[in-house]
Structure formats: structure tokens, C-alpha cells
From Swiss-Prot:
Keyword Phosphoprotein assigned: no
Active site per the UniProt annotation: R18, N36
UniProt keyword annotations, A-Z: Hydrolase
EC number(s) on file: 3.6.1.7
Domain called Acylphosphatase-like: residue spans: 3-89
Full protein name: Acylphosphatase
Keyword set includes Hydrolase: yes
Any one GO molecular-function label of the UniProt entry: acylphosphatase activity
Pfam families: Acylphosphatase
InterPro entries, per database record: Acylphosphatase, Acylphosphatase-like_dom, Acylphosphatase-like_dom_sf, Acylphosphatase_CS
Annotated gene: acyP
Amino acid sequence: MKTLLVRISGKVQGVWYRGWTVETAKGLGLAGWVRNRADGTVEALFHGPEAAVEAMLIACRGGPPSARVDDLRVTPVAAPDQPGFSQKPSL
């Protein structure tokens, strides 16, 4: 199992990036969460089989059709305490 904290920058707020992330992560069977940050980025935690987490990273580089992803910063972290994938309140 692999767990990554990802910070996505670019045109990623106001373009349905969080909703798309929830749907995509659930489709891959991942646990974790996604939220907007005050600095205009989106932050997400992905936990699951390595292949599924890597597939999610590839998907995040494209995002939904109206998004423009400029950068992904990826940090390995500890596994989340709760199952499932959710959208957290913005920070």
C-alpha cells in the first residue's frame, strides 16, 4: 500500500477539480480526501495499492476538462485513519 499527499497548482479551483478527484479516486478504490487551500492550490491524500495511487497521479496531471495543472508536489505520508474518500472543507 502507498500513501501520498499531493499539492496541485494551476487553474484548479472553481473548475470542479475536487468533485472530479472524489469520483476518480473512488473509481480507483482509493481512500483519502481532497480540499481547496487558501493559496489557490488543491491538496489531496491518496491511499491504496501502488498501481492505483500511481494511476491517480497520472490522472491528476490532466484533471477535469476546464482545469489547467501547472505542477504536482508529492510527499509520502502515513496512511489515513478512516476508510473511503471524501471532500474536506477548504483551508
